[in-house]
Amino acid sequence: MSTKTVPEPEPHVLAVDDSIVDRTVISRLLRSSKYRVTTVDSGKRALEVLSLDRNVHMIITDYCMPEMTGFDLLKRVKESAELKEIPVVLMSSENSPTRIRRCLEEGAEDFLIKPVRPSDVSRLCNRVIMK
């Protein structure tokens, strides 16, 4: 009798950025590491995706976006009983210690400075998703 193992599903990352270039970069980095990636262009769209698919293992979001900032998205996720366990990582091209501290205090898992390096994404995913 042979035993077949069911492969583990690929971890699912929701990437949120109003810049198509940054969404593409993050998506390629994650997909090359065997992650399933959904990309959206706003915090509002991210909440719509999360309302339909709760099987998200991590959210990576830009800090500065129109309509709803990444910080606002972080707060909404952490205030939600259904979503609060999803790790949220923020990114920004501005290296502001006050902004970074504020995000971490609000519950962000980490804060990346753009341009994001492949080693940053690999380290982050190994630490956050694989724990």
UniProtKB/Swiss-Prot annotation:
The keyword Ribonucleoprotein does not apply. One of its GO terms (biological process) is cytokinin-activated signaling pathway. Residues 12-129 form the Response regulatory domain. Keywords: Cytokinin signaling pathway, Cytoplasm, Nucleus, Phosphoprotein, Transcription, Transcription regulation, Two-component regulatory system. GO terms for cellular component: cytosol; nucleus. The modification 4-aspartylphosphate is found at D62. Expressed in roots, leaf blades, leaf sheaths, shoot apex, flowers and panicles. It holds the Pfam family Response_reg. Induction: By cytokinin in roots and leaves. Disruption phenotype: Dwarf, narrow leaf, low tillering, abnormal hull, viviparous and low fertility phenotype. The keyword DNA damage does not apply. Two-component system major event consists of a His-to-Asp phosphorelay between a sensor histidine kinase (HK) and a response regulator (RR). In plants, the His-to-Asp phosphorelay involves an additional intermediate named Histidine-containing phosphotransfer protein (HPt). This multistep phosphorelay consists of a His-Asp-His-Asp sequential transfer of a phosphate group between first a His and an Asp of the HK protein, followed by the transfer to a conserved His of the HPt protein and finally the transfer to an Asp in the receiver domain of the RR protein. InterPro entries: ARR-like, CheY-like_superfamily, Sig_transdc_resp-reg_receiver. It is found in: Cytoplasm, Cytosol; Nucleus. Functions as a response regulator involved in His-to-Asp phosphorelay signal transduction system. Phosphorylation of the Asp residue in the receiver domain activates the ability of the protein to promote the transcription of target genes. Type-A response regulators seem to act as negative regulators of the cytokinin signaling. Belongs to the ARR family. Type-A subfamily. This is Two-component response regulator ORR3. It comes from Oryza sativa subsp. japonica (Rice). The gene is RR3.
